[in-house]
Amino acid sequence: ILFKYIIRWPWFVASVIICMACAWIYLKQSTPAYNINASILIKDEKKGGMLGSEFSGLEDLGLLNPSKNIDNEIEILQSKSLIKDVINELGLYIDYTTSTGFKTRDLYGASPILAHYSPKDAELLDAPMLLTVDYQKSGQIEVNVTTGKGSDEEKTFSKSFTELPAVLSGEKGTITFMPNSQVPITEDGKLEITIQHPLAVAKSYRKALAIGPTSKTTSVATISISNTNKKRGEDFINKLVEMYNRDANDDKNEVAQNTARFIDAVSY
């Protein structure tokens, strides 16, 4: 029996080599995912949050009923509307990549050419828009545009520009191409720009987002998100916290103004 296996040793060696080669190719092509974490003190009136101490007297009189608790605030933090605002603010509905061999590299914050396409126009897209940009050191670019990608209404057209900035107008709106001052063009190259509906992008970010309280006795919540680009994940969480706090302060000011008007009316 041993002899039968020995005479077939080349097959075993070949199998091991093939498996190792497949594993190496997979590791080279796969994109690592980063887990980004942060903590936030969220608004919670029941635990002495932004409004609890200021309006507790009115609450006792039944004039103010702050029903929001930490669970409500977590729902606000991971709401599609707030996440979509973050997507629009950071322009995350526009994605930049480049292909080298079999691998696609993410160019978030590192694209030599930036595309501006308004969120309002992006919200009218029924399917992703794909732009393939061939650029030269001289500043010349050739843009191939595919609209309605993957749908029955898929259309393709191209246009060349001799310099940047350049404006491309079409039935799907206007796209402005700008040079990235932080990433100068030093050689000819090619990149792909994908523009999607902001709500579709917001849904994917919401799916990758996890928010929860650190304990039952605290108003501190942890926020974590998995993203293939560490800087993009950090920017997303920072902007999410910033916009949540901004909205919370606006709510606080509105309640304070309405309460002041009510007190003035009662006094009068």
Positions of predicted regions on the chain:
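Hydrophobic and amphipathic membrane-targeting/association helices
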Residues: I1-Y268
